[in-house]
């Protein structure tokens, strides 16, 4: 078991390495800086031997005169190398994290809808944000610890000397000065942390919008828009992180410089005869100092494996997602605009992970330009039929045709470009009204075309009342709009899309009667000259359909016009009686 685990860890790191490799120049610079940093510590302690034996033992005042300058120089070198190593490692880490996040984001946008059916939004957001950040600990924190502390231990074990009680007084002198420095730096930390939290919220929001609006992204071809949006906020987060690292890295050298100045003062004061008489042997001081100095690197090395394993565990989680199969897009047929004929032939479909088919032996033909309505109780399979037209799921048996060709023959982008979707749960993006209407195609449509679509959707009345009209930002998922207003924005989006096939999935079921009347005219306008598949609970909205299909437990049980089905006195007539009491 232990060997298997080690092999798994090594394989994970080997797979992570290609992500780190492009930034290896930063690793090389950091490695050199870390070795110089550890060497400066070791050389600092090595100076205690000539200092105590020659400077104090033989009362050679010249040693005590130049030694403080050497000490200050070494501490400055240590501070500079510490800053360079921390900054370079964090630069590499930030690049690795951003690269992993972008890979995850892009991969998730290509995942099938069934993947999101089985995953919670919070879990996926955690993968993009927190788990990606954890990867940094395996590529940065562990490297810093092993190189710096390892070099320090090797040097310190060579030079063991004792510590003097006089030097311990330095801690008392340094305490108030260091506390002031920490207070100043902490204020800077707080300001940067607030900016980082705000930026992380933007990253999370961008990812959440893509995840919650995954169907809209797919159907409207918004992958590039969402990728650019996410790249922008992700890079902004990286820059904020570098500001935090810069402030953090400079704090240690400042405190160390303060300590070196205090130590230099003690060394200079030691040249006075009254002080020299009270000093012990140099070897005792050096050994004791080395022993104390060894405590920190030993403790760090003890914890480095746990740190490394956390990073590797995060890598394995992310690679599990990256290894998940994306949507199959094997079709070759590309079509500019379909006629709109849609036909289901003996279609059977089962949701992934379930045993009972959601649809069984479905045969349905929707002629171009006609309207077919699907009715039935909740869970009967109506929305499933709509989802199959856009290939959000692939069927088990049978075939679905568009203009006489199997849907699987078309490229996904070409197929979904033929379909406009208006559902009960409208997803709007935290953007302007205009950009929501022209989603993923803002450069393709003119301002006049956007306004015309909004007018035809009876949306300009409330849009004109907004502070900035079409340029008003509507908040996350259109939080500033009512249900009816959000639906009209969605209808305007579908009108502007001008696709030959229209799916209305419970488009008015969540609205009150007044709101439904307000958008019914817009829906009628939208359905003109389009192949329409309407899913509705309210039977009053589909009475004019060319054909009404009744679905029960995944099977078509009735079909016909409104009047024909009422005369048949079957399931549709019962549903109609339940709603209208007739």
UniProtKB/Swiss-Prot annotation:
SUPFAM superfamilies reported for this sequence: ABC transporter transmembrane region, P-loop containing nucleoside triphosphate hydrolases
Reactions mediated catalytically: ATP + H2O + lipid A-core oligosaccharideSide 1 = ADP + phosphate + lipid A-core oligosaccharideSide 2
Transmembrane segments: 16-36, 64-84, 153-173, 253-273, 275-295
Stored InterPro entries: AAA+_ATPase, ABC1_TM_dom, ABC1_TM_sf, ABC_transporter-like_ATP-bd, ABC_transporter-like_CS, ABC_transpr_lipidA, P-loop_NTPase, Type_1_exporter
PROSITE patterns: ABC_TM1F, ABC_TRANSPORTER_1, ABC_TRANSPORTER_2, MSBA
GO CC terms: plasma membrane
UniProt keyword annotations, A-Z: ATP-binding, Cell inner membrane, Cell membrane, Lipid transport, Membrane, Nucleotide-binding, Translocase, Transmembrane, Transmembrane helix, Transport
Entry EC no(s): 7.5.2.6
Coiled coil: none
Positions of the ABC transmembrane type-1 domain: 28-310
Domain (ABC transporter): residue spans on this chain: 342-578
Classification via CDD domains: ABC_6TM_MsbA_like (cd18552), ABCC_MsbA (cd03251)
One Pfam family, short name: ABC_tran
Keyword flag DNA-binding: no
Annotated membrane topology: Multi-pass membrane protein
Main localization category: membrane
GO molecular function: ABC-type oligopeptide transporter activity; ATP binding; ATP hydrolysis activity; ATPase-coupled lipid transmembrane transporter activity
Binding, ATP: 376-383
Quaternary organization: Homodimer.
Similarity remark: Belongs to the ABC transporter superfamily. Lipid exporter (TC 3.A.1.106) family.
Function comment: Involved in lipopolysaccharide (LPS) biosynthesis. Translocates lipid A-core from the inner to the outer leaflet of the inner membrane. Transmembrane domains (TMD) form a pore in the inner membrane and the ATP-binding domain (NBD) is responsible for energy generation.
Domain remark text: In MsbA the ATP-binding domain (NBD) and the transmembrane domain (TMD) are fused.
Annotated protein name in UniProt: ATP-dependent lipid A-core flippase
Gene name tied to this protein: msbA
């Amino acid at each position: 078991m232990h060997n298997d685990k080690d092999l798994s860890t090594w394989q994970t790191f080997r797979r992570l390495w290609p992500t780190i490799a492009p930034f290896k120049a930063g690793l090389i610079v950091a490695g050199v800086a870390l070795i110089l940093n550890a060497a400066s510590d070791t050389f600092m302690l090595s100076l205690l031997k000539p200092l105590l034996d020659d400077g104090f033992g033989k009362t050679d005042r010249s040693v005590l005169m130049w030694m403080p300058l050497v000490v200050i120089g070494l501490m400055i070198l240590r501070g500079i190398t510490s800053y360079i190593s921390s900054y370079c490692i964090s630069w590499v880490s930030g690049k690795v994290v951003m690269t992993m996040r972008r890979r995850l984001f892009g991969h998730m946008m290509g995942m099938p809808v069934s993947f999101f059916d089985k995953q919670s939004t919070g879990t996926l957001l955690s993968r993009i944000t927190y788990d990606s950040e954890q990867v940094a600990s395996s590529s940065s924190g562990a490297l810093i610890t092993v190189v710096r502390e390892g070099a320090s231990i090797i040097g310190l074990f060579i030079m063991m000397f004792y510590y003097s009680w006089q030097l311990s007084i330095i801690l008392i002198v340094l305490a108030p000065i260091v506390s002031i420095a920490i207070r100043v730096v902490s204020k800077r930390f707080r300001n940067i942390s607030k900016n980082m939290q705000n930026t992380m919220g933007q990253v999370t929001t961008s990812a959440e919008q893509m995840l919650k609006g995954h169907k809209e992204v797919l159907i409207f071809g918004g992958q590039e828009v969402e990728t650019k949006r996410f790249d922008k906020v992700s890079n902004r987060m990286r820059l904020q992180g570098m500001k935090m690292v810069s402030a953090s890295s400079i704090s240690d050298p400042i405190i160390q410089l303060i300590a070196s100045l205090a130590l230099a003062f003690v060394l200079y004061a030691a040249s006075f005869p009254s002080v020299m008489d009270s000093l012990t042997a140099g070897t005792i001081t050096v050994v004791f100092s080395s022993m104390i100095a060894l405590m920190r690197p030993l403790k760090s090395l003890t914890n480095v494996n746990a740190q490394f394993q956390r990073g590797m565990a995060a890598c394995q989680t992310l690679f599990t997602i990256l290894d998940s199969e994306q949507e199959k897009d094997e079709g070759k047929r590309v079509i500019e605009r379909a006629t709109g004929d849609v036909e289901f032939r003996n279609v059977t479909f089962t949701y992934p992970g379930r045993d009972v088919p959601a649809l069984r032996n479905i045969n349905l033909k929707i002629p171009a330009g006609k309207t077919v309505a699907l009715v039935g109780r909740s869970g009967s399979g109506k929305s499933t039929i709509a989802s199959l037209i856009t290939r959000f799921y692939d069927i088990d048996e049978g075939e679905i045709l568009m203009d006489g060709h199997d849907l699987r023959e078309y490229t996904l982008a070409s197929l979904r470009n033929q379909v406009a979707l208006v559902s009960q749960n409208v997803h709007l993006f935290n953007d302007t009204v205009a950009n929501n209407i022209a989603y993923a195609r803002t450069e393709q449509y003119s301002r006049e075309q956007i306004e015309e679509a909004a007018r035809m959707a009876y949306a300009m009345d409330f849009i004109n009342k907004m502070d900035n009209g079409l340029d008003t930002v509507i908040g996350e998922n259109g939080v500033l709009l009512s249900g009816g207003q959000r639906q009209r924005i969605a209808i305007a989006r579908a009108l502007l899309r001008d696709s030959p096939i229209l799916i209305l999935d419970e488009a008015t079921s969540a609205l009150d009667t007044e709101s439904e009347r307000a958008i019914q005219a817009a829906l009628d306008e939208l359905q003109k000259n389009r192949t329409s598949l309407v899913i509705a609970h309210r039977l009053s909205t589909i009475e004019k359909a060319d054909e009404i299909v009744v679905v029960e437990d995944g099977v078509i049980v009735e079909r016909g016009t409104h009047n024909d089905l009422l005369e048949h006195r079957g399931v549709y007539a019962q549903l109609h009686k339940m709603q209208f009491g007739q």
